[in-house]
């Protein structure tokens, strides 16, 4: 689909659809493929969602969000619009919309993420600041998650050259409180980005979305001090899935804060000790990132030439088989379909209805688990 500016009504429909409680990125694009527009998807949503407690926000509620955003100077960018970042369109599934507050031109520069431990050592924070400053001087925008430690050091050091803070909550929600001054400074001189609406306070389930945006906005991810079980390594995994460069600074084997970095290097991540190491890794990175199609062809079950009752009966049987194959451990969609034996087109229709009715939980990267 060609990029274009959405009308006020179209933007309202996109926001209503994506703000529906059980509509994540996978379901959003499934509905767009099936019905062709957010307006048509909203018209048919009640037939797909059998739970009476799940309904789209009203037009009035979304218009209030749009008015509040405009009043604050926040823009809501939908994935088809020209100012939506190209690198984020190469993520699968594409985040349907993002809220941005600040200097959006920073997304048009080449971006690199610098992430790491909240409880970082003094030397780790010094290294993050040094790398961020030198990469900023080389023309890169620095992306991070506005957390304590490595994130804060990277943001502060690149404030004059360009930095983007990605949040799990709304762009107006300051978290952690220790970073209040940094957050306020970034509104004026940097850029804040989130998939969440204004005023929203993040929960644990929102941070994977934030992490996926951090890697999605960036050509590569630099990891400085990360424990073996940390959100930082989740971001590194997303970067690999998005075909982005993963780089890590080595550390002492006696420091638990660097065990995750050392493991990444052992698994094939690039070892970096200087900003030049990062520049060398990113030299050809842009050519490796290909945009994703916004609208893949609909499955046969999205436009099936059968009676509605027959199609629904087949979908219901497929749902039972897919649910039996699912577990509480997130599983890749292709593996779930293969184990269930359900044909791919029928499985796509069934999984869409299952997500909309909260029978399954679909991670931001598309992996599926029982709710």
Where are the regions a protein language model picked out?
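Short, small/acidic-rich helices and loops at N termini and domain boundaries
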Residues: 1-83, 357-359, 364-371
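Glycine-biased, small-residue-rich flexible motifs in mid-sequence functional cores and linkers
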Residues: 1-10, 78-371
């Amino acid at each position: 689909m060609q990029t274009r500016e959405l009308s006020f009504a179209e933007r309202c429909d996109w926001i209503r659809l994506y703000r529906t409680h059980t509509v994540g990125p996978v379901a959003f694009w499934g509905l767009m493929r099936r019905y062709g527009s957010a307006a048509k998807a909203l018209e048919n949503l009640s037939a797909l969602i059998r739970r009476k407690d799940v309904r789209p926000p009203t037009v009035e509620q979304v218009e209030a969000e749009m008015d509040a955003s405009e009043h604050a100077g926040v823009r809501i960018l939908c994935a088809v619009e020209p100012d939506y970042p190209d690198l984020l369109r190469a993520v699968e599934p594409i985040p349907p919309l993002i809220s941005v507050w600040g200097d959006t031109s920073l997304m048009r520069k080449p971006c690199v993420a610098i992430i790491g431990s909240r409880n970082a050592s003094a030397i780790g924070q010094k290294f993050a600041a040094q790398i961020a400053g030198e990469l900023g001087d080389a023309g890169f925008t620095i992306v991070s998650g506005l957390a304590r430690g490595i994130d804060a050091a990277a943001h502060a050091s690149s404030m004059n050259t360009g930095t983007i803070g990605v949040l799990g909550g709304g762009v107006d929600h300051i978290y952690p409180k220790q970073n209040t001054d940094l957050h306020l400074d970034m509104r004026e001189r940097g850029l804040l980005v989130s998939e969440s609406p204004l005023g929203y306070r993040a929960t644990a389930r929102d941070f994977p979305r934030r992490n996926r945006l951090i890697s999605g906005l960036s050509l590569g991810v630099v990891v400085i001090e990360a424990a073996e079980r940390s959100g930082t390594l989740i971001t590194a995994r997303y970067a690999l899935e998005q075909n982005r460069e993963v780089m890590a600074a080595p550390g002492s084997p006696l420091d638990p804060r660097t065990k995750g970095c050392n493991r990444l290097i052992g698994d094939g991540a690039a070892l970096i000790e200087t900003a030049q190491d990062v520049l060398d890794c990113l030299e050809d990175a842009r050519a490796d990132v290909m945009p994703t199609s916004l609208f893949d062809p609909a499955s046969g079950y999205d436009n099936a030439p059968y009676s509605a009752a027959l199609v629904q009966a087949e979908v219901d049987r497929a749902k039972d088989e897919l649910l039996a194959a699912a577990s509480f451990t997130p599983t890749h969609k292709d593996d779930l379909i293969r184990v269930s034996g359900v044909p791919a087109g029928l499985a796509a229709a069934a999984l869409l209805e299952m997500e909309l009715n909260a029978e399954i939980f679909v991670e931001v990267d598309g992996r599926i688990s029982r709710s």
